[in-house]
Each structure stands twice: as structure tokens, then as C-alpha cells.
Amino acid sequence: MDGQSSRANGAGCKVTRDVEYSRAGVRFTSDDPRQRPLRLDIYHPPVTLRAAGGWPALILAFGGAFHRGSREDDTVQEDGPKNTPVAEYCRRFAERGYVCFSIDYRLIPEDPDPGTIPVLVNPDNVPRSRLDVVRRQMNLPPATSEMVANGIEAAAVDFTAAIGWVRANAVRLAVDPSRIAVGGFSAGGRSAMHAVFARQAEAAAVVCLSGYLGLDELKRHVSGLPGEPPVLALWGENDLDYVREQAPALVEHAGAVGLPVTAHRIPGVGHFYPASTALAPSADGPATVEHAIEAFLASTLQRARA
């Protein structure tokens, strides 16, 4: 396994950076299509911790409207608090005893090859209010529906490949393949949902931070059949308009088909919020976003191994 290792925080987790997990096409519609490496960073639990039978794993993808962000940093601060980057979630959960992976994936400005198995039911119905804002911030012209769809499809392909790579290397990484959770923030969370529910990548749990599945994709891909993993869905009270609409729709549809979903509508925040953000008060529930993830993973991954 190639990559560069470093100790992230004194005696804390060790990070192996720049590990290639796949190669995939970019410049897809040009006269000069190319392949580029896809890389991930691995956050290993501290050497003081021990795991019998392999560690649980957490694979996370960054947010950025399928346009920007990276596996090292996807922080944004707009009109309020900034989000905790997925790399920091990886560090924190590695210190709890998870092997964590912060993954790279192809973005819309790279003109990615979308693959041959679409996950989107109706590409013309993809909400794009945030995407259009980000393109203006990046001084890019408006994107066509095809460009947007290709980027979303490519991200799902890449996340699926990352899950496959972790599973194929589970023994070498001391990962328990029955306890692999996936997730991400915003576009990363949506890509995790696409990989698991539309492309049938095998995972034991999904953590979706202000991501979603479109209504059409929910109806086609989420059936509640055995093998579909439980989902943790979190979103802000003042989140993006389509997230506020689609996240509750996931909860409703999941309830109808029997898919276990744990949902938290986070009071007083928009799309960007730190891990320390307080949840709605509850007598016996988690206090913060980070605690909600911790409780969900502890519960679902323990059941997956049982």
C-alpha cells in the first residue's frame, strides 16, 4: 500500500496519506480524455487501542456541491458557523477506534466520465440552487444538466470504488468487513447514499450530513429489503431548500418500506454546522452532532457484527 504516514496528534491516530484506490476518467467530452488517480487518506486508531477481529471502519466523502472541496478540507463559512471538515471527523473517530478513510472523488469541473449505470432517474430534476451559487463563486459559466448529471454519477462510481477497495484490503488494514460504515457531508453524503442504495455497494450503515436522495431515487432505489443498511440523517432547520424538503421525505419513505432511519433536524443552523452543534434537547438522546454519529455507529456496527 503506497502512501505517506504521519502521526496526526502526538500519540493519537496515524494518518497514511495519498493512497491510490482507483483510476477514473476525466475530460470525458473533450478530444483528449484521460485517466486520473483517485486517492484517500487513512486514519488509523492509536496504537494504545486494540480490536479483536478487526476494527470497524468509516469511509467519508467531502462536500462542495460536486465542484470543490477536498479530502483534506471542505470547510465553508457563510452567514454563520462553519462546518467541521470530514478529515476532522476521520481523526476524531479514529481516536475512538475506527479505521477512517477520507476519500477523493471526481468533480464536475473535471468533466468526469459518468460510467454506464445511471443512478439518477431524471437528471433534469436535480436541484441546483447551491450548485449555481458555487459556480458563480468559482467564476464558472452556468452548467448544463448533462454536466451536473455526469458529476453526480461519477461521484457515485468513485465512492463505490472506494468501498470496494477498503473491502478488498480489509485484512491488510485490520478492518472488520462486516462493520464498514460510509457517509459524508452534503455532496459527499449524497454520493454515499447513491453508492449504497443505487449501486448496491455493501455497507453496514450510512451517515448523511445534510445530504439527501431525490424523491425519484428514493422510490426506485430504497426498498427496505434485507441487506439495506440503516441511515443516520442530519440536516439544519435552515438548511438548503431542497435538503429541508428531501431529508424528511427520506424519513417518511424509509418508515413506509421498513428501512431503519435515525433522523435529527438540527435547530437554528443552516447547511454548515460544526460537530459540536447542539441537537434538540432530549431526555435520553445525543447532545450534539458528533454524539449522534457516535451513538449511531456504536449501535449499528455492533449489531452488524452480532
Residue ranges and their predicted role:
Residues 232-234, 257-306:
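C-terminal catalytic histidine-bearing segment of alpha/beta-hydrolase fold enzymes
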Residues 60-65, 186, 211, 236-237:
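Glycine-rich His-Gly loop
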Residues 48-55, 61-113, 215-216, 240-241:
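Short substrate-entry loop that stabilizes the transition state in hydrolases
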Residues 1-53:
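N-terminal cap/lid segment of alpha/beta-hydrolase-fold proteins
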Residues 115-170:
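Alpha/beta-hydrolase active-site loop
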Residues 153-226:
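Primarily recognizes the serine-hydrolase "nucleophile elbow" in alpha/beta-hydrolase
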Residues 205-265:
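The feature captures the conserved acid-bearing segment of alpha/beta-hydrolase catalytic domains
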Residues 56-57, 205:
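Structural motif
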